[in-house]
Curated annotation (Swiss-Prot):
Organism: Neorickettsia sennetsu (strain ATCC VR-367 / Miyayama) (Ehrlichia sennetsu)
Main location: cytoplasm
Upper lineage: Bacteria, Pseudomonadati, Pseudomonadota, Alphaproteobacteria, Rickettsiales
InterPro entries cross-referenced by the UniProt entry: Alpha/beta_knot_MTases (IPR029028), tRNA_m1G_MeTrfase_C_sf (IPR023148), tRNA_m1G_MeTrfase_TrmD (IPR002649), tRNA_m1G_MTases_N (IPR029026), tRNA_MeTrfase_TRMD/TRM10 (IPR016009)
Disulfide feature: none
Record field: catalytic activity: guanosine(37) in tRNA + S-adenosyl-L-methionine = N(1)-methylguanosine(37) in tRNA + S-adenosyl-L-homocysteine + H(+)
Annotated residues for binding of S-adenosyl-L-methionine: G110, V130, G131, D132, Y133, V134, L135
Subunit relationships: Homodimer.
Designated name of the protein: tRNA (guanine-N(1)-)-methyltransferase
Location(s) in or outside the cell: Cytoplasm
GO molecular function: tRNA (guanine(37)-N1)-methyltransferase activity
Protein role: Specifically methylates guanosine-37 in various tRNAs.
Gene Ontology CC: one annotated term: cytosol
Family, similarity comment: Belongs to the RNA methyltransferase TrmD family.
Superkingdom per UniProt: Bacteria
Length: 225
């Protein structure tokens, strides 16, 4: 799988994507990353301009982004084109499967006040949000999307069960975890986890996941019902 990123700040990549299991996946060829500097396509050294109609901030130019997209598409045969935006469709765990199947995915990292809508309309660009909050740019959001997708690529995670037991696989959060020491600051590991009884351990984990979901994400419980 290949991710192609359009960004004003290419130096931030791969960043955290270059370490741990995601970084090993990159080094071992399970996925690849191409980073294209938007400033390479600047017009008179500018990539933005003042918004028509007035208002705060600057807007990224459609012609600049269009040239950047044309280059990316001709070079990498883009299958999905995505603009990271707080007003986009919310990116959830189930979104990863569709992206992984797309192979060549373009992630466009915005800056300033926004991008000229004509660029999004002309190239039929999807808008995707990683949450109901605003970031200074799309780079962190792009990294989150890439990380979430790459760990779903077969072979990247050493243990497939790790993926199957995670939060949002199904409609609940992940169960609580414990490791050594058995007792810490007067707090003990639940005895059932040390019992060796796999049926009881499985039941405990189901209940633990349900408790965590009801406490931290009651909206997921409501959606399921």
């Amino acid at each position: 799988m290949r991710f192609v990123v359009l960004t004003m700040f290419p130096e931030v990549f791969p960043g955290p994507l270059g370490v741990s299991v995601i970084g090993r996946g990159l080094a071992n060829g399970y996925w690849s990353l191409e980073v294209i500097p938007i400033r390479r396509f600047a017009v008179n050294s500018r990539v933005d301009d003042a918004p028509y109609g007035g208002g705060p901030g600057m807007v990224m130019r459609a012609d600049v982004l269009g040239e950047a997209f044309e280059y990316a598409n001709s070079t990498y045969q883009i299958k999905r084109r995505i603009f990271l935006s707080p007003r986009g469709t919310k990116f959830v765990q189930n979104s990863t499967a569709n992206l992984v199947e797309a192979d060549n995915v373009l992630l466009i990292c915005g800056r300033f006040e926004g991008v000229d809508q004509r660029f999004l309309n002309y190239y039929n660009v999807e808008e995707l949000s990683v949450g109901d909050y605003v970031l200074s740019g799309g780079e962190i959001a792009a990294m989150a999307v890439i990380d979430s997708c790459v760990r779903c690529i077969p072979g990247v995670l050493g243990n497939l069960q790790s993926l199957e037991c995670e939060s949002f696989v199904g409609s609940s959060l992940e169960y609580d975890h414990y490791t050594r020491p058995n007792s810490w600051k007067g707090l003990s590991v639940p005895e059932v986890l040390m019992s060796g009884n796999h049926r009881k351990i499985s039941e405990w984990r189901v209940n633990s996941a349900a408790t965590a979901t009801g406490r931290n994400r009651p909206d997921l419980v409501e959606e399921e019902s």
